Amino acid sequence: MWKLNRWLSSIFADTILYKLVFMEKLQPNLFFPLAGVAAVASLASCSNKQKPVEQKPLNIVYIMTDDHTAQMMSCYDTRYMETPHLDRIAADGVRFTHSFVANSLSGPSRACMITGKHSCANKFYDNTTCVFDSSQQTFPKLLQKIGYQTALVGKWHLESLPSGFDYWQIVPGQGDYYNPDFITQNNDTIQKHGYITNLITDDAIDWIENKRNPEKPFCLLIHHKAIHRNWLADTCNLALYEDKTFPLPDNFFDDYEGRPAAAAQEMSIMKDMDMIYDLKMLRPDKKTRLKSLYEKYIGRMDEAQRAAWDKFYTPIIDDFYKQNLQGKELANWKFQRYMRDYMKTVKSLDDNVGRVLDYLKEKGLLDNTLVVYTSDQGFYMGEHGWFDKRFMYEESMRTPLIMRLPKGFDRRGDITEMVQNIDYAPTFLELAGAEIPSDIQGVSLVPLLKGEHPKDWRKALYYHFYEYPAEHMVKRHYGVRTEHYKLVHFYNDINWWELYDLQADPSEMHNLYGQPEYEPVVKELKEEMLKLQEQYNDPVRFSPERDKE
C-alpha cells in the first residue's frame, strides 16, 4: 500500500500543489491531510522544482479513562486540582466543550466508541447481561485493513476477547488497582506487580518501543481502569490533598422534587456510599455490604504496600470513629473523603499521561501522532448528592474530550459543536485515509478539526440507558439534548417525562414538563426524538399514540 502511495504521490504531487495554492488560496486554517494518496511537505518554486516529500500516515494514540469527569481536569475547571499533563494535550490542540456519550455506562459506552454506533445497533446494552459480538465491524479492524498496526492495553470490559488488534493485553473485568491480573493474547492470566495505572502505561510504551513495526503507522488504545470506584490511590500519592476542604455543590442536598426517577436511585453519597469499600474506614468490628470486597482488593497488596496503606489510613480511621458523626456532618465528611481519594487517583493518571507524551516527543513521534484523551463517561462529584453516572443529566452524559493535533493542523482552542462518542470511529478512519462505512452512525469530527463550522451539523443528540434493575437502580430512559433543552422519558416500570432549560437551569433542578408555555418546545423535541429513534433504528421508541393515553 505504501508503494502505491509513493507512486501516486510522484504523479499527482504537482496537481495537488496547484490545488492547494491556487484553488484553496492558502487559507490560514488550511488542512493538510496526514494520510492518504499524497501530501506535499514543502512548496517548491517553479524555477527550481524539488521532489515532493511524502508525509507519513499519522499515528493515533487514544487514551481513555473510566469515570473521569471534566470538572476534575484543570483544562476544564480550575476549582479543584491541577492536571498539567492533560492540560498539555488541550494547549497543543483542541478542547471539546460539548462532548457527550450515548449511554453513560462503561461497557456500553466502550461498545459505542469502538463501533461508531448506538447501543441499539451494536447490541451491547448493559454491563449485566450483554457480551460484545466481536465479529462485528470496529474501527481497529478497518484500520488494520489499510495497513495500520493496532494495539489495546488496559481495560476492555466487553466480556468477549478483543479482536481487530495485532497486540492486546487487558485486565479481566474492572481490574484491580494493586498487583493486578492481565489476560494475554494466549488467553493466559498473568499477575504483574505494581500500581495498575503505571503498569498499563509501561505496557503501552513497551509496545511502541519493542513490539511494533516502525515502518507502519499505528493506532494504540491505552484504556485505564482509573478512575473507577473505589478510588484506591497509589501509595506515593496517599498524603496528597489532605489539607484541602471542598465546598459542597449547591444541590448536594437535592430533594428531587418533580423527579421521581432521580429520587429512586441508590447512588447517594449520604445513604449509599459504603463506609469501608468506598471510604476505607476498615475496622474488624464494623460490617458493611461491601466490606469483604474491599478486603479482597487490599489483600492483593504486598507487605510494603499494605504497610504504607495502613500507616496512612489508621489515624484517619481512629479519628473518624471517635467523632461519631451523624446527619449532614457525616455526609460532608464522606464527601471530603471521596473528593480526596478521587483526586489522588487522577494524579496518577495525569502523571502517566505525561509519561506517554514525553516518550512520544523523545522518540520524534509526537508531531505525527494524534493524541486523544477522553473518558467512557462523566461522573457525579456530589452534584444532586450523588456519585456514579448512568443518568442523562449533564454530569454523567457529558465527558471530557481533548486532542493534541499533529503537525499540519492549525486549529487550537475550543470546539463548541455537540459531539458524541459514536463520532470517534469515523474521525479516526477519515484521518487515517480509510473509507467510512455507511452503517456507522457517528459523524467524523474532521471538519471541526479543520476549523469549519458545518451548517448541517447535528442540532440534537440521542441518549438511551438500559441497565435496570441493577446496581444503583437508575431507571431506563431515553432522551434528546439540544443546545437549549433536554427532554427525557423514563420508562419500563415508570412513565415519566422531564424537560430542562439548560440555559436557565444548567443544574437540571426544575422539571418544566407539563407547563403549558412549554408545550411547543415539548412537541418539537418529541418529533426530534422520534426522528432520531427511527434514524438509529432503536426498537424502543416513543409512541405519540400511547403518549395521548
Kindly give the residue locations of the regions a language model identified.
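Serine residues within intrinsically disordered or low-complexity segments
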Residues: S9-S10, S45
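Formylglycine-dependent sulfatase
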Residues: K19, E24-Y491, N495-W497, P506-E527, ...
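Extracellular, beta-strand-rich glycan-interacting domains
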Residues: L502-A504
